[in-house]
Amino acid sequence: MSSLDKTMHFDFNQNKGKNVYDTLQDVYNALEEKGYSPINQIVGYLLSGDPAYIPRHNDARNLILKHERDEIIEELVKSYLGKNK
């Protein structure tokens, strides 16, 4: 049986945590480099949905926009509660 005949399984959630984590790290670093308070800016973005809270520096705005806000909040809550599984 060739590989084209087999049903492939794709688990979208498998890499979400790492991607969100890496994105938040990059955004945090970009905000810090620009002299902003990273926590305040990220919280402002998450609450309002306004990407203007995130600078274009180091492509931070485009990076964070690749994730839905609810997805980011979900990962933050999981991390905070130690439920990263």
UniProtKB/Swiss-Prot annotation:
Name listed for the protein in its UniProt record: UPF0297 protein LGAS_0422
Species assigned in the record: Lactobacillus gasseri (strain ATCC 33323 / DSM 20243 / BCRC 14619 / CIP 102991 / JCM 1131 / KCTC 3163 / NCIMB 11718 / NCTC 13722 / AM63)
NCBIfam families: PRK05473.1
InterPro entries the UniProt entry points to: IreB
Annotated TM spans: none
Protein family according to the UniProt entry: Belongs to the UPF0297 family.
Lineage top rank: taxon: Bacteria
Record-linked PANTHER family: UPF0297 PROTEIN YRZL
